[in-house]
Amino acid sequence: MFDFIIDFETMGSGEKAAVIDLAVIAFDPNPEVVETFDELVSRGIKIKFDLKSQKGHRLFTKSTIEWWKNQSPEARKNIAPSDEDVSTIDGIAKFNDYINAHNIDPWKSQGWCRGMSFDFPILVDLIRDIQRLNGVSENELDTFKLEPCKFWNQRDIRTRIEALLLVRDMTTCPLPKGTLDGFVAHDSIHDCAKDILMMKYALRYAMGLEDAPSEEECDPLSLPTKR
């Protein structure tokens, strides 16, 4: 049985935000199984959404648009239209296909994201959109059977890392130098792989399976940022 992690990149901050892409990676939660950054990225998928078709239906907020203008060129290129762009309806269908193909048990698997008020509410609202398209009335919308894992198995990455490292507000975990070679911040699939590794290493440090690296041996890309 695998767990999974999701990350949306968006044009807003609420559950109705326009979605740029959705990344998902299924992973083995066993702390003795530590895969490389590249191995995790290669197992995952990134679903790129058509932004134009979301105008008038989902929210594009001015502050988020301005925020994207200040990100790296590598991150901003993910916003540009591409031949791989799909509708939100088709994108969620691709997401469901991936979940079903990777040994995810909706009753036992844990689903992870960085902040419980962001990714899962967006995912649930996109599932509701599918129900609306199928003619389900607003007072009958019910996503319980359609979510990839039950709500009580949805977990927050920040809380996990903070609890394992026993330091308030420490929501990133120092990783050995070279662990994140090739990482691009705000590339959703890279963010997912990074967070899997942070949770794994935080657990390994807590269990005494491995010592945390010294400051000199720490990967600088794993050190705290503004977010």
From Swiss-Prot:
Family annotation (InterPro entries): RNaseH-like_sf, Rv2179c-like
Record's catalysed reaction(s): Exonucleolytic cleavage in the 3'- to 5'-direction to yield nucleoside 5'-phosphates
EC number: 3.1.11.1
Family annotation (SUPFAM superfamilies): Ribonuclease H-like
Recorded GO MF terms: single-stranded DNA 3'-5' DNA exonuclease activity
Principal EC category: hydrolase
Lineage top rank: taxon: Viruses
Pfam families: Rv2179c-like
Keyword terms: Exonuclease, Hydrolase, Nuclease
Function: 3'-5' exonuclease that preferentially uses ssDNA as substrate. Plays a role in group I intron homing. May play a role in the final step of host DNA degradation, by scavenging DNA into mononucleotides.
Protein name: Exodeoxyribonuclease
Source organism phylogeny: Viruses, Duplodnaviria, Heunggongvirae, Uroviricota, Caudoviricetes
